[in-house]
């Protein structure tokens, strides 16, 4: 198999699972069991990192009107279908709908925070200190063990209007460092999963860490230009 096929496989797996951490741990398990060679595993892991961005992109759109139809479709496929394959598809669709319903609930719960002085002070500090933002994102993802969840939380915070009721309480310049910290923090799951799994499993986890760390550090060094690129 070519590296490109490995990348596409990783992308597809993460698009279905909606969890880069789970997909990466699965790949590390395959490497440890000798079912997947290290070069191919690294290609799949790189695809996983690309695929996990799809969740954030979907969250950015207003898909709340589609949540209940998606939940109903998933429920119908899971319980009405006779073939296990379609039942699995139904479970995946239902889980996907639950993901967005949870994100919507999270957004409504965060709305009152926009008027809290302590919360506003913290957001001001994060905007003024990119390093603090990176550390915040890193610690959040290490605790939650899901970059998709912390990125969803970040997107909901970024949607909240500040005291003027117009501008974001966090802003893009404040959100990007937190996002970079999320990207670094998600590697901890893979590093924990490779413990006791052999050298190749450890190497696969290290490749995952190096990929995320190098990309995040490069974006952090070029932060002003990176923000302008995103705004463009």
Which residues does each PLM region occupy?
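Interfacial helix-loop-helix linkers and transmembrane-helix boundary segments
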Residues: 1, 82-90, 197-207
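Helix-loop-helix hairpins and the membrane-proximal interhelical loops
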Residues: 1, 93-139, 157, 164-168
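Alpha-helical transmembrane segments of multi-pass membrane proteins, especially transporters
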Residues: 10, 14, 25, 39-48, ...
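Membrane-interfacial helix-loop connectors
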Residues: 14-17, 25-53, 57-66, 77-78, ...
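Mid-bilayer segments of alpha-helical transmembrane spans in multi-pass integral membrane proteins
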Residues: 53, 57, 62-66, 100-105, ...
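Hydrophobic mid-bilayer segments of alpha-helices in multi-pass membrane transport proteins
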Residues: 66-74, 89-98, 134, 153
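Structural signal for alpha-helical transmembrane segments and their membrane-water exit/capping regions
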Residues: 77-82, 98-112, 144, 223-227
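Transmembrane alpha-helical segments and their short flanking loops
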Residues: 103, 114-126, 169, 193-232
